[in-house]
Amino acid sequence: MPRGSSMDKQVIKADVPETGGPFNLCVRYGNQIYISGLPPFDADFAGKLREARAKGAPLPPFPDIPFERQARIVMDHLKELVEAAGSNMDCLLKVIVWLKDQRQQEEFDRIYRSYFSSTDALPARTRMQAGRTPMDCGLEVEAIGYVP
């Protein structure tokens, strides 16, 4: 099988805070979309992370944000990236969810379901408890989807 050219790979940008880590948040290859693990970092906190990384300084502590707000930040960012790639949430094929505390699964599932048009539109999903999440936040979510 011939190798694709770099022209086939497109980095997708959206109004989602970048942390300054060595990765892209979203990459489109043909009609496939790959979304990196998204922690619940708002623009303010992501800016503090970028600044600390640029200076080689200690990273700031994660702010005390209620879990419901963290879940909505992550899902809003996921939706923004999917739409920036030219797709929609119903076109996600696989989602991986890491929860810091599995006791929050019902609350997360309630929020998660609200981002899809129907039960039939839900993607395949793996959910697990993480030993440690980025900056000790409540969750992280990554996804694979397609552009119809």
What are these regions (language model features)?
Residues 1-76, 80-94, 99-148:
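N-terminal presequence-like segments and the immediate start of the first folded domain
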